[in-house]
């Protein structure tokens, strides 16, 4: 009986890391209108819904730092927090302060973490290094997969250096030319 109990504990201890972190994580905005669904199986990806309508569908993201690709290994831990704090502007604006209000999901990995923030009017993510050594960022990979063919306001250009003096092209996403560059920001009507 004691041997079976010890074998059970050993088996559970070895299996524990692989079953502790959920592969699908959801978080909503403070007003519950925006919902982000994060998948952590093999590669981090996210989907976004607003008022129950899917806006972005399974958008993978990763960051190549040194020789490592962040966002493709196993997530060790997931933490959550809600933030509502006043932020004072250093540079004078129309208002003296604003409220920073969001819900955050943090995916913790060996040498980095990925923070997703869900605001009432949008979402954001960022990669944060937790390692002591500094390595260069070589590449960021992200795709925006819209559920429908929405109208976009896009600054199309044939070069990456730009002074933002051209007109924006207003077209459905699928009508944009595949062989041209676009620079941020791009606005999409949903």
Regions found by a protein language model. Name each.
Residues 1-24:
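Bacterial Sec-dependent N-terminal signal peptides
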Residues 24-190:
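N-terminal accessory beta-strand-rich subdomains and adjacent acidic, glycine-rich linkers
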